[in-house]
């Protein structure tokens, strides 16, 4: 079945491929529309770039600069220029009358506009800005603003051409060229070239101007007029002829031309980062060595001093980058002819060579210790201990009532510290420890060790003190049994509370004082019944058996207990008076008392 499906599915496979191709084309069309929409939106979001422009209009005595046509147009947000005139947009630039004009004996034919009597002043801008060609790419700010320096004469004076849409024109014949040289109107289509104001201001050698006068435009361009100082018509005619003078091999290429609304003004400096970066470093050096053209034509320009911009790769930016890399302090200083801030890199050398120049402000590094009110050189351990002491004093202690049970010959008391129920429920392990205590020094040391080492929050400590007596049921014994148990219970309670006050434990302590004939047997039975986690006891009791490691009671519990037994042995005091010649045995039984109970004669 599978083979038949693959063998007979040739037609369906072709239709599937065609469907996939159509789907791909649809996706590509959708992506293209989306990109165009994105470019249009980005073009409206960028900040406008204010630039100054100047148009040349015809006059009776040749071409002249018209101060009323000095405009300041933004990048993309300004409304079209032709809308302010009549609201009409030229359909195509081919309908305009253009002619070639030659000025000077050796200069090539420059292209200029010969307007018809019905031509508008805004047609020249509208034809280049709103032509039927593809719109400029607006994915990047000033993407169409690619300024480049063009050499126009032997003095290497730089001019910047401007043209947005260079139309393809047919080659003009020799007769048409002769007609243009003789100032005869020609209908040949040619490329349109509009000289920027900066190009108009470039000084060249003197040359005569042979330009056919035409009627002036009907209305000036009503757009953000920025009027310069008055200019004479004769000087402008001479300067226009100087601009048109060039060699045949130095025609301005089309790739160096840009729209008129993106040209630079007569005196404005670079106003965007992209235009600054596109200028070469050679042109910057030439501008520093030679006097600026705007200074020579100060009567034609408007004095606008923009802020200084640190260009990419400049010496100032490299110096700042080196200072940042070396960690030197950036000291600001102002030059005599510049208002921008600069940084002094010599402050680091002065501070290292002579400490007097360095700042007196000491640097205090940040530490991980939390600031506290304790003014001492100790670390955070002491602060933690004092905080624990404050917490321990503030914790509540619940001391239960004393219960005396005559039938069992015992007295019981329960002590709870802190929130024991919450601690027991939240603890991962709840241990129960069994402590034998007879108020001897060894047993008190065992109690201190158990509270300080073993106990954790939620644990339970059972303290048992067994008092041996011959006949607990006797009346005389019962009368003093209760008072003795209460006295012992109070002593144990006082000692345990003293130990707990030095900790922040939330534990439960059960204290039992019992009278019994055989203390060893009773404790073994209690261990088997309670089943604690660990039994803690002292090395010896009240028998004062010196010289033995374990007493009889401790030795018995170690051998008979069903749970682990921990014997806390207190460190023995060294005897200062020692016999030098006598050897000391490890188990000295000279002072031992032999238990004669159960001996048979």
Swiss-Prot record:
One of its GO terms (cellular component) is cytosol. Keywords: Phosphoprotein. Residues 127-364 are annotated as: Disordered. The modification Phosphoserine is found at residues 247, 281, 335. InterPro entries: Rossmann-like_a/b/a_fold, Universal_stress_UspA, UspA. Residues 286-296, 313-325 have a biased composition (Basic and acidic residues). GO terms for molecular function: catalytic activity. Residues 141-154, 265-281 have a biased composition (Low complexity). It comes from the Eukaryota. Residues 128-137, 159-177, 199-213, 232-250, 338-356 have a biased composition (Polar residues). CDD domains: USP_At3g01520-like. The keyword Transferase does not apply. The keyword Phosphoprotein applies. This is Uncharacterized protein C167.05. It comes from Schizosaccharomyces pombe (strain 972 / ATCC 24843).
């Amino acid at each position: 079945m599978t083979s038949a499906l693959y063998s007979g599915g040739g037609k369906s496979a072709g239709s599937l491929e065609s469907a996939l191709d159509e789907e791909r084309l649809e996706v590509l069309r959708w992506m293209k529309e989306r990109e165009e929409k994105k470019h249009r939106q980005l073009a409206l979001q960028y900040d406008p770039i204010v630039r100054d422009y100047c148009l040349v209009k015809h006059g009776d005595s040749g071409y002249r600069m018209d101060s009323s046509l000095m405009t300041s147009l933004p990048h993309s947000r300004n409304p079209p220029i032709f809308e302010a005139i009549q609201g009409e947009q030229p359909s195509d630039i081919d309908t305009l009358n253009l002619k070639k004009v030659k000025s000077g004996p050796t200069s090539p034919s420059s292209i200029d506009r010969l307007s018809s009597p019905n031509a508008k002043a805004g047609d020249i801008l509208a034809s280049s800005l709103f032509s039927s060609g593809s719109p400029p790419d607006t994915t990047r700010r000033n993407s169409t603003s690619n300024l480049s320096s063009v050499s126009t004469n032997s003095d290497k004076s730089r001019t910047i051409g401007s043209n947005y849409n260079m139309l393809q024109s047919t080659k003009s014949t020799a007769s048409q060229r002769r007609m243009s040289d003789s100032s005869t109107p020609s209908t040949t289509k040619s490329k349109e070239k509009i000289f920027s104001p900066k190009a108009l201001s470039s000084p060249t050698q003197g040359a005569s101007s042979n330009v056919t006068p035409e009627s002036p435009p009907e209305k000036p361009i009503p757009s953000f007029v920025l009027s310069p100082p008055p200019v004479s018509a004769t000087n402008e005619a001479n300067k226009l002829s100087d601009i048109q003078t060039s060699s045949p091999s130095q025609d301005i290429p089309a790739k160096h031309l840009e729209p008129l609304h993106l040209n630079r003004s007569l005196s404005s400096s670079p106003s965007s980062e992209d235009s600054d970066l596109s200028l070469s470093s050679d042109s910057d050096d030439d501008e520093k060595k030679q006097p600026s053209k705007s200074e020579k034509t100060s009567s034609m320009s408007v004095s606008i001093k923009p802020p200084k911009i640190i260009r990419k790769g400049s010496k100032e930016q490299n110096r700042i980058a080196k200072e940042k890399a070396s960690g030197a302090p950036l000291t600001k200083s102002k030059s005599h002819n510049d208002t921008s801030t600069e940084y002094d890199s010599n402050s680091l050398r002065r501070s290292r060579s002579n400490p007097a120049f360095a700042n007196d402000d000491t640097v205090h590094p940040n530490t991980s210790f939390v600031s506290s009110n304790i003014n001492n050189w100790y670390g955070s351990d002491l602060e933690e201990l004092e905080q624990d002491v404050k917490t321990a004093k503030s914790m509540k202690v619940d001391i239960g009532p004393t219960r005396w049970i005559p039938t069992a010959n015992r007295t019981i008391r329960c002590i709870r510290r802190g929130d024991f129920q919450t601690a027991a429920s939240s603890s991962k392990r709840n241990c129960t420890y069994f402590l034998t205590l007879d108020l001897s020094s060894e047993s008190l040391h065992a109690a201190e060790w158990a509270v300080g080492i073993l106990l954790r929050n939620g644990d339970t400590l059972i303290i048992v003190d067994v008092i041996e007596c011959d006949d607990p049921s006797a009346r005389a014994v019962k009368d003093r049994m209760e008072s003795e148990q209460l006295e012992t219970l109070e002593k144990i309670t006082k000692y345990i509370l003293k130990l707990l006050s030095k900790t922040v434990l939330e534990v439960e302590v059960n204290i039992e004082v019992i009278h019994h004939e055989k203390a060893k047997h009773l404790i073994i039975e209690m261990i088997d019944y309670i089943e604690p986690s660990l039994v803690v006891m002292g090395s010896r009791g009240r028998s004062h058996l010196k010289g033995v490691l374990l007493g009889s009671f401790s030795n018995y519990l170690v051998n008979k207990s069903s749970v682990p037994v921990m014997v806390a042995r207190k460190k023995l005091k060294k005897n200062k008076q020692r016999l030098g010649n006598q050897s000391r045995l490890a188990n000295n039984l000279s002072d031992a008392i032999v238990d004669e109970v159960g001996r048979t004669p």
